[in-house]
Amino acid sequence: MLRIKSSNLRQEKFQASASLSLRWPVVSLLQPSLKFPSIMELRINVAHVERIARELGVKAIHVGAVAHLFSEGSTVPFIARYRKEQTGEMDEVKITAVRDRMEQMQAIDDRRSSILKSLEERNLLTDALKDKITKADSLTVLEDLFAPYRPKRRTRATIAKDKGLEPLADWIEANQSDRSANPTAEAEKYVKPDAENDEQKVKDVAEALGGARDIIAERFSDNAEIRAAMRKLYQDQGTVTSKVLYGKEEDAEAAKFRDYFDWNEPLKTIPSHRMLAIRRGESEGFLMMRVNPPELNATALIEGMATRAISPGADQMKLAATDCYKRLLGPSMETEMRLESKKKADAEAVKVFADNLRELLLAAPLGQKRVLGIDPGFRTGCKVVALDAQGKLLFNDVIYLIGSGNTLMQAKELLTNVVKHYHIEAIAIGNGTASRETESFVNKIGLPKHIPVIMVSEAGASVYSASDVAREEFPDHDVTVRGSVSIARRLMDPLSELVKVDPKAIGVGQYQHDVDQNQLKASLDDTVLSCVNGVGVELNTASKQLLSYVSGLNSTHAANIVAYRNENGAFKSRRELLKVPRLGDKAFEQAAGFLRIRDAEHPLDRSAVHPERYALVEQMASDIGCTLPELLSKPELRAKVDLKKYVSADVGLPTLQDIMNELNKPGRDPRKQFEVFHFQEGVEKPEDLQIGMKLPGIVTNVAAFGAFVDIGVHQDGLVHVSQLSDNFVKDASEVVKVAQRVQVTVIEVDLPRKRIALSMKSKPDFEKKKPSGPPGQGGGGQRSFSSSGGRPQQGGGMGNPFGGGDWFTQAASKGKK
């Protein structure tokens, strides 16, 4: 469960670094002003601000304002909604980008300071070197500049230096243009076969020249210009090559990586999912991956930068260049490219996960209705719960849909009585094992037609049911009851319930266990924070898990709010929050606008208008001769308000327009209206599918290569990116989103290989695709059937979308070699 918000930890780190190095002036955000200090007045690194402004296409003063607001403890949602004038109306994406780039540049500055200190302490810092280090704008450039001076372990070059061969290396470099210079003759001066110390012995000319070349090769490897040129060569001409390890070709577990047994692709164009698939094959011991440019081009690059002469000395330089690439610079650059390509793939995979999670969290809520929740099952039975409109558990029991007719009659009687007794308004059925069978049974027992029966994703429900949160909520019930409650509540309000589950257990990510876990957690936490505050939170009913994601609040604040609420009853006003222990003015300022009180004493407490603007709205009402409630309830009165009259040093038109929009629809929910969805009747298992069949479906996952769609057969089908539209589609997320309802056509059903291929084209090709090999080899593989009905489970097993298993590797590998 996400209890600690990385965004808050990042915020504290940002504030600490700002207070130490940026020296921000104190400005009260409780009294915001459009008269914002200049960048120079803020004492911000102007170069950083200007660079970020160029990258994002915004004004430098707005970047400085965002940085200042962060240093004062403001959050991304607060800045985006309530400080539009200061930021030039930046959205959350750009505000987050400013934060992240400021952190990156702070890291560069920290490393710069460390390098300068190291060089100064060793008396190695020249004015020219200091100037280069000061101007370096990336960690890569800094490390290249520092490479020749970095304390080294014992290398072939240091061994040669200990033998006294550095002067010979200097001589070769100095005389490389002299055709008459004789390196062999010069090397004879350094031959010392009888030296008392073995570490200083040089037995012959060959050893002397070899040692000199070792020194020269290391100099090439440490040269910042050569490293930069080689890096560009790798980026432009590098190829990712994948080979199967000897003896692994027939390994059953290796079959899922068969596409990559002999694969090569340009580094600059390889998709993230393919890079991650190859890396997984390597980590599991089936593949070997290399990243290299053409060797001749690489050695020629070093030779060309080292010497252009034709002489015996130049020949030694060229030999050193070849050795440098094969032994030093090549392996170093390959490692760097592997790391950089991994970072790029991680970033894209994390973005896919975050985008999918956002769609899932912002799915349309049913609302406050009495719901019957059913967690279906065969052998263990179907767990049934009844909840009131606030999500409180009223009843629980188990029914069995297999066995004698008497068992089915008992199940029918129980459901009928529960629906009638508790005035059930909707039925939620988990979409796991036995879901379609349970749905069919419920639809046939004669319940009122106006009660919708809705399939709900149960991904992560088992994780919630075994969590501390669930045990705290339902200490007297077992995991089966808790899981059923979670399914029912997800129908009522997906956002409020899903925040209790670790997003990685929800199953909407891509290679989630392979990517950088800190980066993944930070991005997902940012996404949850954005969604929670974008929707707003009802203060008197929200769980402490939901409250902990409100802007400005943490888990301690949330727990204290719930404790205060339990002890003193419902909050009657936002201002009452200030009575909560350890919740101060700053937390109140950041949180208040995102908290709603449905039955508040002050009408604006039900809206997203911030308390700092209440006086302004009351002045609007006074100026047109009405009360505040009248202004809120009568559109004709609001139409009389001239917003331009209220522009001041504190408030601009963007904020005024936001206020008026909120007055028009106080506390509006930005999520879509709920619509009942039904799968195709009579299509409940893969064997029911036929080529050309058109079916309704729900998108469950979106990846770069396509979208997975639930069509109600316990197994998601894949709509490959080439089948998403009649037009060319580069990225599946441009066409479909998680939880989107779509119409698909079945174009392939391969039961032995457990694959379903779908199309969203207006005229799809129904021709049966012929497999190019055994499972795992081409053909756009699908998610494998599992005992859980193909539904996502905890962890990275076969049933977890993007969490692991051969189905993903197969699907991800589809493409032309």
Regions found by a protein language model. Give the residues of each.
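Low-complexity, acidic/Ser/Thr- and charged residue-rich accessory regions of DNA metabolism proteins
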Residues: 189-195, 205, 302-306, 311-325, ...
